[in-house]
Regions:
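Substrate-binding cleft of extracellular glycoside hydrolase catalytic domains
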Residues: 63, 67-181
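N-terminal module-boundary/linker segments of secreted carbohydrate-active enzymes
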Residues: 1-63, 68-75
Length: 181
C-alpha cells in the first residue's frame, strides 16, 4: 500500500509544529460523551462549561471495536464517537484515538499481562496474526469512515499501544522485545 497524506493531514501537521513552538493544546478524554452528573447529552462538555470552549484535543478509545461491539469499553456507542470526532473537526479541534484492545492470546483485557508471548503471537507467522490483522482491519475501516458530508477525510492522531515503556499492558516493555514491539 502507498499512503498519501491528505491536505487536511498536512495542515494538521503544520499546525502541530506551530503550536509546539508556542505552547500546548489542552485535551480531555471523552469530553463530549459524559461528565460530572451527565452522560450522552448532545454538545455538552464539562470543559466548555468551566472554560467557555471545547478542549483543543478530545480523545476517544476504540476498545471493543475489534470485537465487533457497538459500544466502546467506556460504554459509548461507536456511532456517537464517530459523530463527536466529526463535530470536533468542524470546530477546528483535534481528535486523538487510543485503542485498549483485548489480549488476542488470552482473551483478557489490555491489562492482562499473564503471558509474555502475546506480541510474538500477533506477528507474521504467529498463532494470532490473522485474528490481529482482522482487528486492525476493523479499526482501519472505522478511521476511514471519518469523513465530512463533502467526503473530506478527517485526520486523527492514532495512538495504539501507548504507554509501552511501562509493563501494565500486554504490549509493554517487559512483555516483548524492542524488535517485536
Amino acid at each position: 500500500n502507498t499512503f498519501v497524506r491528505t491536505p487536511e493531514t498536512e495542515h494538521l501537521l503544520a499546525n502541530l509544529k506551530k503550536v509546539s513552538s508556542r505552547g500546548f493544546m489542552f485535551g480531555h478524554h471523552d469530553d463530549t460523551n459524559y461528565g460530572i452528573g451527565w452522560e450522552g447529552d448532545e454538545g455538552r462538555s464539562d470543559v466548555k462549561s468551566v472554560c467557555g470552549d471545547y478542549p483543543a484535543v478530545i480523545s476517544f478509545d476504540l476498545a471493543h471495536l475489534e470485537l465487533g461491539d457497538t459500544l466502546s469499553r467506556d460504554k459509548v456507542p461507536f456511532s456517537k464517537i464517530r459523530r463527536e470526532i466529526l463535530n470536533q473537526y468542524k470546530r477546528g479541534g483535534l481528535s486523538s484515538l487510543s485503542w485498549h484492545l483485548r489480549n488476542p492470546l488470552t482473551g483478557g483485557d489490555s491489562w492482562d499481562v499473564s503471558d509474555t508471548t502475546v506480541v510474538k503471537s500477533i506477528l507474521p507467522g504467529g498463532a494470532n496474526h490473522e485474528k490481529f490483522a482482522g482487528w486492525v482491519s476493523k479499526v482501519s475501516a472505522f478511521i476511514n469512515s471519518l469523513q465530512t458530508e463533502d467526503g473530506v477525510k478527517v485526520p486523527v492522531l492514532f495512538r495504539p499501544w501507548h504507554e509501552h515503556t511501562g509493563s501494565w499492558f500486554w504490549w509493554g516493555e517487559k512483555l516483548c522485545t524492542p524488535e517485536e514491539y
